[in-house]
UniProtKB/Swiss-Prot annotation:
Belongs to the peptidase C15 family. This is Pyrrolidone-carboxylate peptidase. The active site is at E78, C141, H165. The keyword Cytoplasm applies. It comes from the Bacteria. GO terms for cellular component: cytosol. Removes 5-oxoproline from various penultimate amino acid residues except L-proline. Gene3D superfamilies: Peptidase C15, pyroglutamyl peptidase I-like. Its main location: cytoplasm. Homotetramer. GO terms for biological process: proteolysis. It comes from Clostridium perfringens (strain 13 / Type A).
Length: 213
């Protein structure tokens, strides 16, 4: 099995992106699966183009994209991506699409086909704070998740794909009072455990993972 895992470069004035740094730290072989790592730009369209180029090159079985979600307390596999770009800030090339469909011929939303609840359970069972997230936002993270799942539905039908958001690391919150963070080693371990769960679970488990609001 080949797993392509991507991480964004820093954005929004940050000098580091824990998503990318954690991706760099994970093993290149997990439960017999080959892990291929890819840095992508925090830029609308270009991020997707780079992922599709890599898909064409290596023909992966799984594509997982990792992004930073400052303010979250744990590692959060995403359930769904919506067909909407609505950028609160500019991307790294100054683009700021507002209320724009990602693909005009795409569905309103696509759901991850990764075993997200099994991933959360694997992390929690090993001491990593984790939960299912039901919103990937409307910035480049959602753009990438939606775009990859669009490609999976239209073109690469045998690929399993999804997205994981990770918290800030402590160095990023020194001047952000009362903002949660997680050690980079724990984030990397969470990603490794998530890949383990993907390799070992063709189908997701049935367990509570929803939210009241």
């Amino acid at each position: 099995m080949k797993v392509l895992i991507t991480g964004f470069d820093p954005f929004g004035g940050e000098s580091i992106n824990p998503a990318l740094e954690a991706v760099k730290m994970i093993p290149e072989n997990i439960e017999g699966a080959q892990v291929i790592k890819l840095e992508i730009p925090t830029v609308f369209r270009k991020s997707l183009e780079k992922i599709e180029e890599k898909i064409e090159e290596i023909n992966p079985d799984v594509v997982i994209s990792i992004g930073q979600a400052g303010g979250r307390f744990g590692v959060t596999p995403e359930r769904v991506a919506i067909n909407m770009d609505d950028a609160r800030i500019e991307d790294n090339e100054g683009n700021q699409p507002i209320d724009i469909s990602i693909y005009e011929d795409g569905e309103s939303a696509y759901f991850s086909n990764l075993p997200i609840k099994a991933m959360v359970k694997e992390m929690v069972d090993n001491g990593i704070p984790a939960s299912v997230s039901n919103t990937a936002g409307t910035f480049v993270c959602n753009h990438v998740m939606y775009g990859v799942l669009y490609l999976v539905n239209k073109k690469y039908k045998n690929i399993r794909a999804g997205f994981i958001h990770v918290p800030y690391i402590p160095a990023q919150v020194v001047n952000k009072p009362n903002t949660p963070s997680m050690a980079i080693n724990d984030i990397a371990k969470g990603l490794e455990l998530s890949i383990k769960a993907i390799v070992l679970n063709d189908n997701d488990i049935k367990t509570v993972g929803g939210a009241v609001c």
